[in-house]
Each structure stands twice: as structure tokens, then as C-alpha cells.
Amino acid sequence: MDLPGPIHEILVLFGGFGLLLGGLGVVLLTNPIYSAFSLGLVLVCISLFYFLLNSYFVAVAQLLIYVGAINVLIIFAVMFVNGSEWSKDKNYWTIGDGFTLLLCITIPFSLMTTIPDTSWYGILWTTRSNQIVEQGLINNVQQIGIHLATDFYLPFELISLILLVSLIGAITMARQ
């Protein structure tokens, strides 16, 4: 970023202090939830340093990928750690359970109706004639987006489905 000197130095000091505090929290805290939050703080501070170094794409990727992965880590930690006394004593049917049931019923039916009607051949062999491919007009981020939307569309979607199935499997294993 093009920031004035004092503001840039304050942000660097804030990021360094956050890194030290978060690193100590990861090592010293015994609760896995607090430790995962501390690791999230470390990763957000690293992303701040990428922003300060004018590497915006890497900073956003750091936030989306690594901090998002920390949220998954928190979910796994909550699932595998013993539940609280309240969750063992009371068994209520909540609005969230009904909403989840509705989603679990409607999503497979919508997939069964849309997947057979999709022209997969047209998706796999999308031409780039209607896109700007002149190297001077697009940057690296746009090139990554073009490749994900054309060449790697089907593998990208398959990987997301595999991750979804693994998350559902982990939730099922944790409940048993």
C-alpha cells in the first residue's frame, strides 16, 4: 500500500505484535479452540504483511484459504472434543434441524434434475474467442479466473464435492 511512513510503521508494529501474541497463544493455550483462534490471528497478521507489501492477491488468498482452513479446524476440534453438559441433557428439535432436513431433501433432488440436463461437453470445451486474451489487458488474477472457469471447471467442482463429502463424513463420525 502507498501509505505515509508513520502509518506504515504502526501497521507493521501491530502486525508483528499480533504475530508474537498469536504464536504464543498457539503454543501455550491448552484449549484447542483458543489455540485455533490464536493461529487464525497469526494468519490474519501474515495477510496484513502481504497487504503492506502490495501483494493483494496473495493476501486475499491467505485470508480465504488459510483462515478458512482454520475455521474448518475449529469445527473439527468442536466435533471431536466432548460436548458440554447442556448438550448431553437436552435434546430439542430446533429450527436449524428442520432447515438442515429441508436442505438435505431438496439438494439431491435439484442435483438429480439439473445434472442430466447440463451440457458437459459445452462446459469442457469452452472457447476463448469471446474473452479478452490479449496479454496487455489482463493480469494474473484474471488469467487464474479464466482458467478456473474454462479449462479447470470440472476438476474444480469435483474437488469441492469431495471436500463437502469429507466434511459430512467427519460430522457423521463425530456424532456416533
UniProtKB/Swiss-Prot annotation:
GO terms for molecular function: NADH dehydrogenase (ubiquinone) activity; quinone binding. The keyword Transmembrane applies. The chain crosses the membrane at residues 10-30, 33-53, 60-80, 95-115, 152-172. One of its GO terms (cellular component) is chloroplast thylakoid membrane. It is a multi-pass membrane protein. It is found in: Plastid, Chloroplast thylakoid membrane. It catalyses: a plastoquinone + NADH + (n+1) H(+)(in) = a plastoquinol + NAD(+) + n H(+)(out); a plastoquinone + NADPH + (n+1) H(+)(in) = a plastoquinol + NADP(+) + n H(+)(out). Its EC number is 7.1.1.-. Gene3D superfamilies: NADH-ubiquinone/plastoquinone oxidoreductase chain 6, subunit NuoJ. Keywords: Chloroplast, Membrane, NAD, NADP, Plastid, Plastoquinone, Quinone, Thylakoid, Translocase, Transmembrane, Transmembrane helix, Transport. NDH shuttles electrons from NAD(P)H:plastoquinone, via FMN and iron-sulfur (Fe-S) centers, to quinones in the photosynthetic chain and possibly in a chloroplast respiratory chain. The immediate electron acceptor for the enzyme in this species is believed to be plastoquinone. Couples the redox reaction to proton translocation, and thus conserves the redox energy in a proton gradient. PANTHER family: NAD(P)H-QUINONE OXIDOREDUCTASE SUBUNIT 6, CHLOROPLASTIC. NDH is composed of at least 16 different subunits, 5 of which are encoded in the nucleus. Belongs to the complex I subunit 6 family. This is NAD(P)H-quinone oxidoreductase subunit 6, chloroplastic.
